[in-house]
Amino acid sequence: MPHGQPCGACDGSCRMAQRGTPSTSPLIPSLTPSPPAGDPSPRSSQRIDAVRVPARLPGGSDHPEYGMPLSPRALRPYLARGPGAFCAPPWRPDVNRLAGDVNRLFRGISTSSIHVTEDSRTLRRALLDFYAMGYTHTRPTLECWQSLLQLLPEQSFPLRATLRALNSEDRYEQRFLEPPSDPPNTLFGEECDVSGDESPSEEEEEDEASGESSVSEFSPEEETASSEYDSFSDVGEDDSSCTGKWSSSESESDSESDAPTNNHHPTTRASAAKKRRKRQPPKGERPTKSARR
């Protein structure tokens, strides 16, 4: 029986006035006696507080969020196939279903993404944005829904029907969801803070490249100084053990003072070298065979 008609449980006084019509109907009078003047009925005041403006306006007006009402015949083909077949009225939040769906998305990111941490943050941010829109009463338009979920107008039929059914409810009481009672066995979204899978962004790569190019290279003077430093560091090492000869004339002069004195063998290597210098012929003359030897 239509709402507002008299029946065993309704006396007709709770009927809702149509838009643009007077609050009382002269065709269907009230079946209950009117209360005395100055004695308002507490029952009627409570009923007025519970009245909520329906989301579907009278006459099936076009709603900015989910459009015109859809017939079951037009909706049925899109509930079983296509990208839009992810919801159907009636719809209620299910924390176990939500945990499983989010975990499947994390699995796809962890197995195929090259930026696991960055993409995981993106998914978490998207979930929070949709919650924040509902909490702040920010309702997307139909075109905004289609753009966010990347659906064609025909593919959004199930979504439109589901949104209309949700908004046609009288009221929702605030409640808090507990953690899922049946969580997934493997949580693909769990990762440590230092996972090593974050690749540097383009800005970081440019900074590193500029830092490498700005490193000063050794100049020829610095290389010469470093080579001289290396040669000085090796002076203290005696190379006579490996060559069997004195390394320079300075070492010969040093060895002359350090050479052991022997009365029977006064000739040293230093004196022999001096004798060889005296035997050298003047410039321009060829040395004799004995001098060559």
Swiss-Prot record:
The alphabetical list of record keywords is: Early protein
Descriptive protein name:
Transcriptional regulator ICP22 homolog
Q: What ranges does the record list as Basic and acidic residues composition bias?
A: 282-293
Q: A Pfam family name for this chain?
A: Herpes_IE68
- Residues covered by region (Disordered): 1-49, 175-293
Task: Name the domain of life this protein comes from.
Answer: Viruses
Locate the compositionally biased regions of type Basic residues. Answer: 272-281
MF terms from GO for this chain are:
identical protein binding
- Would you kindly state one Gene Ontology biological process term found in this protein's UniProt entry? regulation of gene expression
